[in-house]
Amino acid sequence: MHILWFRRDLRLSDNEIVTIAAADLKPVLPCFIVDPWFYEQSEVGKARVRFLFESLENLDQNLRQLGSRLYLFEGNSTTILQDLAKDLLQQGIRPKLFFNRDVQVQYGIDRDRAILDFYSQHNLECHLGLSSFLQTKGDRRDEWFNEYYTYQRQPLHVAPSRINTPQLSFNLPQLTFDDLKQKYKKFWLKDSTYFRGGETQALATLDSFLKRRFHGYHWKLSRPWLAQQGATSHLSPHIAFGTLSTRQVYQSTKARVAELGDQPLAEFSLKAFRDRLRWRDSFTQRLYYYPELAHTNHYPEFDDYYSPQELDPKKQELFQAWQEGQTGFPLLDASMRQLKTMGWMNFRMRAMCATFLCINCGISWHHGARHYMNYLVDGDLAIDNWQWQMQAGITNPLSDTFRIYNPNKNIEDRDSDLKFIYYWVPELRGYNLPEILSGAYIDKSEYPSPVLNWAQTRKVNGKIVSDMRKKVKQRLLAEQGEEYEQAAIAKKAVDKYWESKDKQYQEYRNKQAGSR
């Protein structure tokens, strides 16, 4: 009996463990474990759990079309899998466990190790697969780039046409989907849902993006209103839960470019999109090497300044204004309100809101990261918490600069027609762009005055962060150890990325000029 343990790989297509476990119609037991520990965490957002449950429902529907079904067990994952193996052994069935690697914090690392140890002690086989690219043998970051593209170009795993799941009974806590909705109903209470879960929806979303929505992606992705309307892929929650693989997306975009023929602008947009996929997987790889980075500063020089400790009353007041979208900075507040309602923001707004909290408010990224994870439908520790450290000015200390976004300048650059601000901050609908930029609304509307002086806090707090970065750089240069080598590799990767972006843009302009 092949136990097929789904986790963040909730799909049948291009799923290594599904293809191998179901081969030759061997008996397969597909299962998902609803672990109460996960749903009790403060960082678990309702939008994300609802998306997960919808994805499980769709996975069950797709399995039933192949003659199978999804078993929902409830309890501690380690205990359930151990008890399931014992139950099958008592029935005279030797199970083999199939599951994909998932980059985890310490809880998940310990859980997977305990499960593998149990199966080894009982002379039971395990097959550990990959749901997306990950270097798992040794530290070969200098080879990561080439290995990543080799993986993405490999043939997709073909979904089986039938899955043989015998009728079995188990003395284990199980749930039906009706049970799931009733027992965890707090995650289903929201009426409107902006992102629907499931492999079927993932494929439809990818199809609509590649057919029409991708046009102009390279510049629309940083415009929050256009991104909200579908100018970005909206695939991030699907990739986070594995209802779609990055390899499927990569190969589909390459096929679309070939289908379109000589269209430089389309090719440029889709190349920009594929680059984002690579960055996403590189963040996952980093957490695999350094799981502690999910909760600790990358460099100890920042530990006194960026701490998860409870905020003092003044900073707590700033933090609450930031959370509620009541800072008096219109674009920032629109973005934070969008997050609470949709469970999503485009990348530029996530970064802008993060730098404002960390640099201008002087509040640790730990607090902001928890808030994001409470609401993001696509929340992923590997990406989100590393991005928070980037926006806090912690990463890439060998570079002499770090970004601090100006919320008002970004109104001119990213929302000059004010559609995004008017939608999320209706208090300002009576004001035009010059009036909003000049603060004409202050003390004349229900909208709050700015909670801080942006220019002053940028200067003062920006210098504090800059000085800490210099200390890190000086130490790394003096030590010339592994930390320095990794920092140098990181800086080289960032520099190479921007060089490649410049090169791609120049190639696009040359092709565009040649086609006239």
Predicted segments, located by residue:
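N-terminal beta-strand-loop-alpha-helix module at the start
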Residues: 1-69, 466, 475, 479-482, ...
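Short alpha-helical segments and helix-capping/turn motifs at coil-helix boundaries
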Residues: 12-18, 80-84, 111-114, 223, ...
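Beta-rich, aromatic/charged-enriched effector core domains that present basic-aromatic interfaces
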Residues: 69, 77-200, 204, 389, ...
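Short catalytic/ligand-binding loop motif for oxyanion handling, primarily in non-cytosolic enzymes
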Residues: 12, 38-39, 81, 105-108, ...
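Active-site-proximal binding-pocket segments
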Residues: 231-425
